[in-house]
Amino acid sequence: MYKVEQKADKIGSGIQNMIQGAKKDYINMSTSYGKKELTGYSKDQVDKWENLWKVETGKKYIRVVRENGVFCFIVREDSGRFKKGDILKAAGYRAPARNSARGNVLTGNYNIQWTGPLYMDSQRRLRA
């Protein structure tokens, strides 16, 4: 798990902060938090990390895709219970799960894993 603390003025830079946070978590996981060297497949993944991501803008959401799977959705504008920049889990390839935000790319201060953003439950505990 990596904590993304940076705030962002624009959603695009917030998404880049999130992607870099996921990369840092991947490196930490692959090296046992610095106890071993980054080699083989893991090193190849880190070397081409930025090229594995696509950001696709839709009407309400921005879809963040890593390789062929949706990493998350980002809310484009305030709507109902969600704020601009909120990170939502994917319900499928085309739509987010609208149960709970997992953080906000504009305000920062959220937790992420290389497998996806974490969110807080009602007791403010981290959950995958």
Locations of the language-model features?
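Intrinsically disordered, low-complexity regulatory segments enriched in Ser/Thr/Pro
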Residues: 69-106
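Negatively charged, low-complexity tracts enriched in Asp/Glu with abundant Ser/Thr
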Residues: 1-55
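Amphipathic, interaction-prone secondary-structure segments
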Residues: 41-83
